[in-house]
Structure formats: C-alpha cells, structure tokens
Amino acid sequence: MSKLKIDTKRRFSLLIALVLIISLSSCATTQTNVTTKTVFNQETTYHNLLKLKKWQANGVIGIIYDNQAESANYTYLQDGDNFSIKLYGPLGIGSIEIKGDTNSVSLANSKGQKLTAKDAKTLMLEQLGWYVPVEGLKYWIKAIAIPNIRQTSELNTNNLLSKLSQNGWSISYSNYQLVDSKYPLPTKIRMSRDNLTLKIVIKSWQI
C-alpha cells in the first residue's frame, strides 16, 4: 500500500513538471536574425512597436564618460510607465537597481542603501557620474522615436531605423532580431550626447 502511494506521488510530480515545461515552452520568446532580404512595412512596424508596452531585455552595457570607461551586465524591465534597470558585474560598485515611474525614481545598491529622486538622470549623475535616459529609452530601445517630439532619422535596407537624433541624443542601430515573429528589435545600440556614450548589447528579449 505504501509503495502505491509513492508511485502515485511520483506520477503526480512528473505530471506537474510536464505541465510546467509545456507552459514555459508556450510562453518562450522566439528570436530569429533579420536577413538583409527582409523589408518591413514602416508604418505597421512602428505601430506594432508602439503598442509593445511590456518587455525584458538582458545584455551588456558599456559606458564612456569624462575619459573613463566602465561596463556592466544589465536586466531592463519595462511595464507601461514602470521600469527597473539592474546593473551588476564589472561596474566596480557592486550591483545596483534603478526603478521607478513617471513620478519618482529610486536607486538601491547591494549594501542595502536606497535613495530616491524625482527623475533618474539626477539620481544617476549624483551616484554614478553618468546616466541612462530612461524617459526616452523605453522608445529608443525598440528602435522607434518618442511620439510627437521632433526627430531626424535614417532607415536601413530593411526599412528599420539605422540612425535617430532626438532630445539631444544621437542613436545608431545595428543588427536586428525578429522577436515572436512580429517585432523587429535591435541587438546593438550606440547612444551619445555631450561627453557621454552608451553602448548597449541586447543578448535576449522577453516579451
């Protein structure tokens, strides 16, 4: 009788594991390289990307400022107006997390210290000496311009952004992947303004 109970428990555990595997597989984000032969409809692509409000991007960021160079791994989550950017690795200050919305931003480090401010730029400049333009990043990381703000841009042979100038930033894009068979998203971004340059490599997208 006890053996029957063990077998039943094992079967139940296997069933649960199988259900979890199927669920995770169905939610997995697919990514394929965009070939030079693929040409996208610019208007359709823009509206699809504009409607994309929630994602996670993982990769590496390089920062060049005031004749200094740093790098870090990152995880960037966006959900509507809410965002979270986790930086960790060779940054030299341990791990940090910047999170917030349109009203306030907080920065927490691995020592448990937490600071708040009205905007990310002020907080990051005070603590890091450089900043990520989070207000624009939620558009620029998808390779689209901020709506209703003046900009100049150039397209590549795929009809996707290769260069964008907006809000004082010069942004260039190289390498795209088609995510979930619908969204052409960049994997390499270079952003510069004044004496600050950000080199963003996106290793994976989850949407």
UniProtKB/Swiss-Prot annotation:
Principal location listed in the UniProt entry: membrane
Localisation: Cell outer membrane
The keyword Protein transport appears for this protein: yes
Cellular component terms (Gene Ontology): cell outer membrane
Lipidation (N-palmitoyl cysteine): 27
Lipid attachment, kind S-diacylglycerol cysteine: 27
SUPFAM superfamilies associated with the record: Prokaryotic lipoproteins and lipoprotein localization factors (SSF89392)
A UniProt-annotated Pfam family: LolB
Bilayer topology term: Lipid-anchor
Keyword NAD (UniProt): no
Signal peptide stretch: 1-26
Gene3D superfamilies (alphabetical): Lipoprotein localisation LolA/LolB/LppX
UniProt entry keywords in alphabetical sequence: Cell outer membrane, Chaperone, Lipoprotein, Membrane, Palmitate, Protein transport, Signal, Transport
GO biological process: lipoprotein localization to outer membrane; protein transport
Family of this protein: Belongs to the LolB family.
Task performed by this protein: Plays a critical role in the incorporation of lipoproteins in the outer membrane after they are released by the LolA protein.
Assembly mode: Monomer.
Protein name (Swiss-Prot/TrEMBL): Outer-membrane lipoprotein LolB
Organism expressing this protein natively: Francisella tularensis subsp. tularensis (strain WY96-3418)
Lineage: Bacteria, Pseudomonadati, Pseudomonadota, Gammaproteobacteria, Thiotrichales
